[in-house]
Amino acid sequence: MSDKQKKPQKLKARLPRGFVDRSASDIRAVNEMTAKIRAVYEHYGFDPMETPLLEYTDALGKFLPDSDRPNEGVFSLQDDDEQWMSLRYDLTAPLARHVAENFNEIQLPYRTYRAGYVFRNEKPGPGRFRQFMQFDADTIGAPGVQADAEMCMMMADTLEALGIKRGDYLIRVNNRKVLDGVLEAIGLGGDDKAGQRLNVLRAIDKLDKFGPEGVALLLGPGRKDESGDFTKGAGLNAEQIDKVLFFVGIKDYAESAAQLAELVAGTSKGGEGVEELNFIGSLVTSAGYQSDRIKIDPSVVRGLEYYTGPVYEAELTFDVTNEKGEKVVFGSVAGGGRYDGLVSRFMGQPVPATGFAIGVSRLMTALKNLGKLGQDEVIAPVLVTVMDGDVEAMGRYQRFTQQLRAAGIRAEMFQGNWKKFGNQLKYADRRGCPIAIIQGGDERAEGVVQLKDLIEGKRLSGEIEDNASWREARVAQETVPEADLVAKVQAILAAQAEDRKRAE
């Protein structure tokens, strides 16, 4: 084969599965949203901190390395000292490591918030990505459930700060101790029943999806779905199933609290959990948060195994249309709970902790559905065109650009091939530039510049029928002294803003 036939293959540009590139509008929307979240957290007295993207794999807790490679659920690599590191799976486990490592220097209670990307080595799907952003808030070193109540109130305030009205969201609260008490009361206490307890938790977690009848099947012998696939159940008997369904079916906690307390009486943690729920309910009510905002709801079962007490979830209650065209409730956008065991793994002593995570991408989708995000105007930059390439001319163009920027106006000088002026105006049109600044040799000699109102010009171009009329009208273009450049640009931008406002 000749050398001519051996053409080097081009590298194929491809995005890894489960990852997305982010556009300017997405980034601005996230920045707008996180700024509002951050303001609420700051008002509550929380401080920011960051942890690295990589942690030693054993610090993540849920995903310990196997003999060859710790690849279940996390992205991992082996360092040159043969230690395994993984991209963080969430923001909570790295926080626990940070607190344990700096325990003697940290002031407890430690109130902190963090925003950042987390990574899941899982099969991607529609709306399910391997990299996504979370925004967390946590209190470390506060053993009382008043810290959990504060988290619930902060979740409610955050959603309202983002423009979500009361009635469109609900903070639902349960307690893992109560659930564990119910399981103990029906004979599922002890280490030997751990697997069966986990199956019960998974069944309860499907309540919204399958309803009480479907959950009853999953608690009992099992359930066959529409495709014929069979999911083995938890193997409970009818009496056990009735007690579990009573617990998760409680609609009015105040009416059922006494009956629930009776059910878990005599269990190691159940009674304590009921008291904690009652305390949280009293605290949030005293602070002005009624049950239409924060509600005790025993059907909340968060899947992470390290929750040890109160668990809470922020649900958006308005309807949206799913990919099948069906009306469905939007659902959960944030959740968390008490995880007294997570920091303790490093310490050998109890370290109480509670906190929650907001799913930034999911919440952003909800806010866009409500028209609460991305509404702020972002005006494209004014374009200073380039007519001459000599040093003096370039210096003038750059000076015009800097004068506009100094006045707070977005501006850029054209950086492409300046010799094709038509391409500069095409660039301005595609970029959505509101104004083009033009100065050729004649204008430079007179100390003037031409200002082309591209927005008005585009509108009028549809009304003027021929080029002769266009040239005669000289619409949307005027010549001003260099000294008046900034003031005239400001006036044109203000007029364009008025036009947009009238068009709304």
Curated annotation (Swiss-Prot):
Highest taxon above the source species: Bacteria
Substrates-to-products reaction catalysed: tRNA(His) + L-histidine + ATP = L-histidyl-tRNA(His) + AMP + diphosphate + H(+)
EC number of this enzyme: 6.1.1.21
Location(s) in or outside the cell: Cytoplasm
Encoding gene per record: hisS
Source organism (scientific name): Rhizobium rhizogenes (strain K84 / ATCC BAA-868)
Stretches of the chain forming a coiled coil according to its record: none
Gene3D superfamilies assigned to the protein according to its UniProt record, in alphabetical order: Anticodon-binding domain, Bira Bifunctional Protein, Domain 2
Keywords for the protein's UniProt record, in alphabetical order: Aminoacyl-tRNA synthetase, ATP-binding, Cytoplasm, Ligase, Nucleotide-binding, Protein biosynthesis
Family matches, as InterPro entries: aa-tRNA-synth_II (IPR006195), aa-tRNA-synth_II/BPL/LPL (IPR045864), Anticodon-bd (IPR004154), Anticodon-bd_dom_sf (IPR036621), His-tRNA-ligase (IPR015807), HisRS-like_core (IPR041715), HisRS/HisZ (IPR004516), HisRS_anticodon (IPR033656)
Top-level EC class: ligase
Keyword Ligase: yes
Name this polypeptide is given: Histidine--tRNA ligase
Molecular function GO terms recorded: ATP binding; histidine-tRNA ligase activity
Family stated for the protein in its record: Belongs to the class-II aminoacyl-tRNA synthetase family.
GO biological process, one term: histidyl-tRNA aminoacylation
Primary subcellular site in the record, as a coarse category: cytoplasm
GO cellular component, one term: cytoplasm
Subunit structure: Homodimer.
